[in-house]
Each structure stands twice: as C-alpha cells, then as structure tokens.
C-alpha cells in the first residue's frame, strides 16, 4: 500500500513541478512575444536574455505583504486563491502525455475535465464578494455570467468528441484518432473544434474575453484588492488553465501524442523516432502561442457582445452541429469507424 501511495505522489509531482516551471516561463515567453509584436524587446535584464525574470518576479511577490481590506471577509478572502488554483491543478491528473503516461487513466476523464473547469469560477466569485469592493464585485458578476455562458458551449463541443470517439477516456479518444493528420477530429468536427477553442479562451478570461479583469473599466476586476503571493496564486491559476485548454485542444482534436505523418509510407518511418510527448507539446505550444497572439491583436469585447456571442452564436451552433453529427454517425458516414 505504501509503495502504491509513494508511486502516486511521485506521479503527481512529476506533473506539478514541470507545470509550475512551464507557467513561470510562459509569462516570460508572453512578454517577449508581445514585445516583438509591438516592436520592443521585452524583459532582457535579469540573467542572460532575461531568462531569470520569472524567478525575480516570484521573489518580488513572495516578499510583498498580503494586505487584507478592512471590511473584507478575512477567511473567504484568503481561501479564494486556493479555490481558484486547486481545480486548475487537479484537472491535469487525466491528461495523457503519451501512451500510458497519465496520472489517473479514468473512464470518465472528459466528465472530470468539465467538472474541474467549472469549479474554478468559485474562487473568482468568492474573491470578488469577500473583497467588499465594488470593482471586485463587478468583476465577479462578469466572470460568473461569462463562465456559465461559455461552459455550455464547451460542454456541447465535447459531446461531439464523445459521439465521434465513443468513449470519455482521454487516452481512448487519442487512440480513436490514430493515423495521419487528416484523420484527426479537427477536420470532421471543425465547427465544434472552433467553438471549443473560442469557449476555452473565454473560460480562461483572456483577451479578447477578459471582461472580468477589464483594466480600463473596473481597474483589475475580481483580484483588485489582492497583493503578494495571494495575487500570484490567481496568476498561476490563470496560466495553468491556459496551458490546460491548450493541451486539451491537442488531445481531443489534434491526435494527442500521434505523429501527423503516422501511417504514411515515407514520412511515417522517417519521424518514428520522435517521442509522442514531443508531438503533444508541439501541438499545445501552438495553441498557447495563439493566446499571446490574441492578446496582442484583438480589442476587448463589450459585455453585451460577449453574451450575444455565447448565447446566440456558439450554443445554437453546437446544437445544430451535434444533430448533424449524430445523423452522420448513425448513417455510417465519416472517419469514425
């Protein structure tokens, strides 16, 4: 029993430690990429080419005081960051990095992911309410409405993946996409793929859907009263969720660890030496780059535009395509057999 527990803890930390490092350096990459897009250098002073900047930022936040507003609900104010970060980390337990390389290979993996992504908003709601600030409360109201709206669209998009793969096990979904890149789910499920990606960006409160923070409108939204490591935990949760949505997109629609040349006569054997985890990381890196690209490119949606997009475009679009997809699957049409 103790060996089993030790092995489980080892697997958990084998995922969490690289994840924390990835989040830290994702912030560095974001500042460098957006800097180049805006024709400036970005961080380049701390360490060679600024590579130690994330460590400097972490130390700065570590030594800052966590100030609690006078009229805030102290207990809830301190609990909220933990409630935001825990679902963001727990969701990684079912992500398969390669064949058999997963912390918990459960059959209800897709349902588990939906549950974890839904729970994260409670941290935002409690943070805004406990701060006793009108700006934080406005950010909380926006965040809750946004997550409810886009969680439905994302859930319907993932139902399409379930219909196509015939399983909720994430490893099983990846196995169902075995073959070259045109046999992955991105092509037959293209409308659902696009809706999933738009909903994923909205769920993580990133530009152009960052109305919950809205610096130009409500100062900084739900975490306006937070400082020090309490603020850093919210920051960590946001970037962990961004990476999670990117890895999920690669897993559910782009074949996971499968090579894009798998099964091809010449290119297939030529790329057989590349480990599956490298392909997965490369696909996820593309989606992570898109987050940065969107932030540097698109203006923020107005609140009414965001709600209209979710309720009048994405949700009806997923319902229509699910009806079409069900007919195709039952009719034996498509690459699902």
From Swiss-Prot:
Residue intervals passing through the bilayer: 9-29, 77-97, 110-130, 154-174, 181-201, 229-249, 274-294, 313-333
Q: Which InterPro entries match?
A: NADH_UbQ_OxRdtase_su1/FPO, NADH_UbQ_OxRdtase_su1_CS
Taxonomic superkingdom: Bacteria
Under which main EC class is this enzyme filed? translocase
Q: Recite the UniProt keywords alphabetically.
A: Cell inner membrane, Cell membrane, Membrane, NAD, Quinone, Translocase, Transmembrane, Transmembrane helix, Ubiquinone
Q: Does the keyword Transmembrane helix apply?
A: yes
Instruction: Give me the reactions it catalyses.
Output: a quinone + NADH + 5 H(+)(in) = a quinol + NAD(+) + 4 H(+)(out)
What EC number(s) are associated with this protein in UniProt?
A: 7.1.1.-
List GO terms (cellular component aspect). Answer: plasma membrane
Name of a matching Pfam family: NADHdh
What's an example GO BP annotation here? aerobic respiration
Chief location category: membrane
Query: What membrane topology is annotated for this entry?
Result: Multi-pass membrane protein
Q: Which GO terms describe its molecular function?
A: NADH dehydrogenase activity; oxidoreductase activity, acting on NAD(P)H, quinone or similar compound as acceptor; quinone binding
Q: Where in the cell is it found?
A: Cell inner membrane
> What cystine pairs are annotated?
none
Q: Tell me, what does this protein do in biology? A: NDH-1 shuttles electrons from NADH, via FMN and iron-sulfur (Fe-S) centers, to quinones in the respiratory chain. The immediate electron acceptor for the enzyme in this species is believed to be ubiquinone. Couples the redox reaction to proton translocation (for every two electrons transferred, four hydrogen ions are translocated across the cytoplasmic membrane), and thus conserves the redox energy in a proton gradient. This subunit may bind ubiquinone.
Subunit details:
NDH-1 is composed of 14 different subunits. Subunits NuoA, H, J, K, L, M, N constitute the membrane sector of the complex.
Q: What does the sequence similarity comment in the record state about its family?
A: Belongs to the complex I subunit 1 family.
Q: What is this protein called?
A: NADH-quinone oxidoreductase subunit H
Source organism = Halorhodospira halophila (strain DSM 244 / SL1) (Ectothiorhodospira halophila (strain DSM 244 / SL1))
């Amino acid at each position: 029993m103790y060996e089993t527990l030790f092995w489980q803890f080892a697997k958990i930390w084998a995922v969490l430690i690289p994840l924390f490092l990835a989040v830290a350096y994702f912030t560095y990459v974001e500042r460098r990429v957006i800097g180049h897009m805006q024709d400036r250098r970005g961080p380049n002073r701390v360490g060679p080419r600024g590579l130690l900047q994330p460590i400097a930022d972490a130390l700065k936040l570590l030594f800052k005081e966590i100030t609690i507003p006078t009229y805030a609900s102290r207990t809830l104010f301190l609990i909220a960051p933990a409630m935001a970060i825990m679902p963001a980390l727990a969701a990684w337990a079912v992500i398969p990095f390669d064949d058999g390389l997963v912390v918990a290979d459960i059959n209800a993996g897709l349902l588990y992911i939906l549950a974890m992504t839904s729970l994260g908003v409670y941290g935002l709601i409690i943070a805004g309410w406990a701060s006793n600030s009108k700006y934080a409360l406005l950010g909380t109201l926006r965040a809750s409405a946004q997550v409810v709206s886009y969680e439905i669209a994302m859930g319907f998009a993932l139902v399409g993946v379930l219909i196509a793969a015939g399983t909720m096990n994430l490893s099983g979904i990846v196995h169902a996409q075995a073959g070259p890149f045109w046999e992955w789910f991105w092509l037959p499920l293209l409308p659902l793929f696009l809706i999933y990606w738009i909903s994923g960006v909205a769920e993580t409160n990133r530009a152009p859907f960052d109305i919950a923070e809205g610096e130009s409108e409500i100062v900084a939204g739900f975490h306006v009263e937070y400082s020090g490591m309490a603020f850093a935990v919210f920051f960590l949760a946001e970037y962990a969720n961004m990476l999670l949505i990117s890895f999920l997109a690669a897993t559910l629609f782009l074949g996971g660890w499968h090579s894009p040349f798998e099964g091809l006569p010449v290119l297939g054997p030529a790329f057989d030496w590349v480990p599956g985890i490298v392909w997965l990381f490369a696909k996820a890196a593309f989606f992570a780059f898109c987050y940065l690209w969107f932030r540097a490119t698109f203006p923020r949606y107005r609140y009414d535009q965001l709600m209209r997009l979710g309720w009048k475009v994405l949700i009806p679009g997923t319902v229509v395509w699910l009806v079409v997809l069900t007919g195709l699957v039952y009719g034996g049409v498509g690459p699902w057999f």
